[in-house]
Amino acid sequence: VSASTSANSAPSSPAQKKGIPLRFVTAASLFDGHDAAINIMRRILQGAGVEVIHLAHNRSVAEVVQTALQEDAQGIAISSYQGGHVEYFKYVVDLLKEAGAEHIKVFGGGGGVIVPAEIKELEAYGVERLYSPYDGQNLGLVGMIDDMIERCSLGTYSDVTVAATELSGDNGRNNLARLITAIERDELSPEQQSSLR
């Protein structure tokens, strides 16, 4: 499988136009040792120019969400072949909401394990997209990755109005991650820059 079609997609976000890649966290869910699928998706994401923080297999919701927050990721991609996916994905959405990070988009798949009714339920709950075997047949692997990239590119990036005074307290670490991203993307106003000095 070649990711060349993804790499040829025109950058659609301001950050991508500046050459700054999207950031994804990838993992297989808790008690799931089936990491072949997520490894393939991770490699295609990387081939498309996405920065990937790969957690491998058997990862808890807390680990995945905390990593996404600390890395200021735009997307999370999870494979789940072990069952328990409805609760797992809902908990991911819940923890992101609790952290004020609903801008992080959640994607997943699990072959035929996640049935159409569950896909509908989870997407209504807040999962951005769950890919079925039918999607794989119609879109192909690269097409699914292109869809993920497009959905994250159109999304809201981190709030760059984080001030130095907001780097303490419960959300201090999350705000610090957002601030670092804003600095990397050269998105701070002169006033914001001077408040950090």
Name what the model sees in each region.
Residues 2-60, 197:
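Non-catalytic terminal/interface segments that mediate subunit docking, oligomerization
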